[in-house]
């Protein structure tokens, strides 16, 4: 969302004050854009990259908000200022749990959509990680596996691990 939107409207749309998030559940929300179409990216004979809108494939986009304890802007209206969480900055366990809550929300939304292939980003593992970056990157695959293996969901045949709802779960690479 643009920083040019007045603060009261931003607050109404977000409905979460992440600067005061002292519990992981503050990050347990997912926003879904269903029935989206993505296009293939191609290279023309001149080496220019372009989107080939004739080659589209359906997808659903799921967005989550992970904790920010590493980036803070200079202005009060800055997105990073409005999301910086000093509690998570001081407490790795809270930060990790917030990341896990965001991943949980996203994976549950994807399972409810019937998503076959879940493509996961490293939530909060870049500039938002701050001093926790190395530890989170080392823990990230374990966090995903904990959710896929240990989270039990109701199914017609009884409880099943969340991971059974997907054909594949792909964790993107960080560079």
What are these regions (language model features)?
Residues 1-175:
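Macrodomain-like recognition of ADP-ribose-binding/processing modules
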């Amino acid at each position: 969302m643009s920083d040019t939107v007045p603060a009261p409207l931003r607050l109404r749309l977000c409905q979460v004050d992440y600067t005061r998030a002292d519990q992981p559940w503050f990050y347990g929300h997912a926003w879904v854009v269903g029935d989206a179409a993505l296009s293939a990216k191609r290279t023309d004979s001149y080496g220019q990259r372009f989107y080939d809108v004739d080659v589209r494939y359906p997808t659903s986009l799921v967005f989550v908000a992970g904790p920010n304890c590493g980036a803070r802007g200079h202005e009060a209206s800055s997105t990073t200022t409005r999301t910086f969480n000093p509690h998570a900055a001081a407490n790795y366990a809270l930060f990790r749990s917030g990341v896990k809550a965001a991943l949980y929300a996203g994976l549950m939304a994807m399972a409810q959509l019937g998503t076959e292939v879940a493509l996961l980003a490293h939530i909060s593992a870049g500039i938002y990680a701050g001093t926790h970056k190395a530890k989170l990157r080392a823990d990230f695959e374990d966090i995903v596996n904990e959710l896929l293996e240990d989270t039990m969901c109701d199914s017609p045949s009884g409880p099943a691990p969340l991971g059974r709802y997907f054909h594949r779960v792909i964790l993107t690479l960080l560079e």
